[in-house]
Amino acid sequence: RFTSAFSPVAFSLGLLLVMATAFPTPGPVGGESQADATSNRPPLTSPDKMEEFIKYILGKISALRKEMCDKYNKCEDSKEALAENNLRLPKLAEKDGCFQSGFNQETCLTRITTGLLEFQIHLKYIQANYEGNKEDANSVYISTKLLVQMLMKKVKSQDEVTTPDPTTDTSLQAILKAQDKWLKHTTIHLILRSLEDFLQFSLRAVRIM
C-alpha cells in the first residue's frame, strides 16, 4: 500500500503507467519502480480480461462505500431516492441488450461504454471532493477511464458511442460544487452506489459475451 509520502498526483501517475503497460502507446513510457507494486494498482490486463478488471474497480468502490458508511453514516437510505433521480445517473435497461433475455452484444457494449462515459462527470466530482481515501477515489476514476478504452476496442460501431456534451459537464459541475457538506456526502454515496450497480450488471453481461 502507498505510504503517506505519496501524493494523490503521484498515485495517479503511477496508475497511468500501469495503464500504459496494459495498452502500449505510440511513444516511449517510463517504467515503474518496484515500490509502486501495490494493491492499489489494477491488474495488468488485456481486453479479454475485462471481467477481472471490472471486479478490481468494484472492490475499490466497495472500500469507498464502506468508508462513507463508517465515517459519515452514509449507508443505504431509501429517502435519498429523490436526490438520485435529480442526478440522472446511468442505468442499464432491458432495451440495452445486456440482460440474458434479449442479449445483444454490440448494443450492450455500446450502452455500457456510453454509460461509463456519462459516469466520468460524476467521478470527476468525487475525485475533487472526496475527503476520505484519495488513492481509492483516484483509482476508481482512472480505472473507469481505462475500462472505457478496453470496451472501445470491442465496439464495432464506435460512432454509436455517445460522448457527453461538454456544456452538460460544466453545468453539472457547477451545480454539484454549490452543494453543502451533507448533500456532497449524499451525492458521493449515490454516485458510488449507482456505479456499483451499473458495473455489476456490466459484469454479468461480459460473462456471457
Curated annotation (Swiss-Prot):
Signal peptide, first to last residue: 1-26
Gene Ontology MF annotations: cytokine activity; growth factor activity; interleukin-6 receptor binding
Gene3D superfamilies with a match to the protein in the record: 1.20.1250.10
InterPro entries given in the database record: 4_helix_cytokine-like_core, IL-6-like, IL-6/GCSF/MGF, IL6/GCSF/MGF_CS
Residue numbers of Phosphoserine PTMs: 78
Compartment list: Secreted
Disordered, as annotated region: 28-47
GO cellular component, one term: extracellular space
PROSITE patterns from the UniProt entry: INTERLEUKIN_6
Cysteines joined through disulfide linkages: 69-75, 98-108
One Pfam entry name: IL6
GO biological process: acute-phase response; glucose homeostasis; hepatocyte proliferation; interleukin-6-mediated signaling pathway; liver regeneration; positive regulation of multicellular organismal process; positive regulation of receptor signaling pathway via JAK-STAT; positive regulation of receptor signaling pathway via STAT
Main location: secreted
Keyword Iron: no
Keyword Protein transport: no
Keywords on record: Acute phase, Cytokine, Disulfide bond, Growth factor, Phosphoprotein, Secreted, Signal
Subunit structure as annotated in this protein's UniProt entry: Component of a hexamer of two molecules each of IL6, IL6R and IL6ST; first binds to IL6R to associate with the signaling subunit IL6ST. Interacts with IL6R (via the N-terminal ectodomain); this interaction may be affected by IL6R-binding with SORL1, hence decreasing IL6 cis signaling. Interacts with SORL1 (via the N-terminal ectodomain); this interaction leads to IL6 internalization and lysosomal degradation. May form a trimeric complex with the soluble SORL1 ectodomain and soluble IL6R receptor; this interaction might stabilize circulating IL6, hence promoting IL6 trans signaling.
Protein family: Belongs to the IL-6 superfamily.
Function: Cytokine with a wide variety of biological functions in immunity, tissue regeneration, and metabolism. Binds to IL6R, then the complex associates to the signaling subunit IL6ST/gp130 to trigger the intracellular IL6-signaling pathway. The interaction with the membrane-bound IL6R and IL6ST stimulates 'classic signaling', whereas the binding of IL6 and soluble IL6R to IL6ST stimulates 'trans-signaling'. Alternatively, 'cluster signaling' occurs when membrane-bound IL6:IL6R complexes on transmitter cells activate IL6ST receptors on neighboring receiver cells. IL6 is a potent inducer of the acute phase response. Rapid production of IL6 contributes to host defense during infection and tissue injury, but excessive IL6 synthesis is involved in disease pathology. In the innate immune response, is synthesized by myeloid cells, such as macrophages and dendritic cells, upon recognition of pathogens through toll-like receptors (TLRs) at the site of infection or tissue injury. In the adaptive immune response, is required for the differentiation of B cells into immunoglobulin-secreting cells.
The protein's name: Interleukin-6
